[in-house]
Amino acid sequence: MQSQSKKFCAYALAGTAFAVMLGLSAPSLNAQSAPFAALAGSWSGAGRIDLQDGTSERIKCRASYSVGDGGLSFKQQLRCASDSYKFDVNSNIQSNGGSLSGTWSEATRNLTGKVSGNASASRIQARVDGGAFSAGLNVYTNGNQQGITIVPQGTEVKGVTVTMVKGQG
């Protein structure tokens, strides 16, 4: 049972990291004065979760964004499902002079954490922390598509890759 709980936490952290990264990719979509303005609306996509034992699972995700503070903050709701897990993540992200910070929660398992990072024109590098779990994150944005890579540390999850498209779903 402990292994199953640890595996769920790894998936939940990966999902949370993914949720945060969807939000953090906004600076490449819009000017620095309103980095999250282009996020408003719905996004959807699919990808893969790779496990340390060499197996993998497909994952599908849908996200919705409510942007505020003139494009400097947003609230996000993300729902993802693979063959083994479903999770529902909420995040609140702010931008302050190019530095990104925020919080996330996964309601079904009462998990919470923080995010921090930096952005350039088309690439985001960030870190998500939640208790005993952490993950490194990279996002590349091109138009209305986002490519996301997540590498959790200390879990059964080796990595997560997802492509999202705005306005579908």
Locate each region found by the language model.
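Generic N-terminal leader/processing signal
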Residues: 4-5, 28, 164
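Central antiparallel beta-sheet cores of small beta-barrel/beta-sandwich binding domains
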Residues: 32-142, 149-169
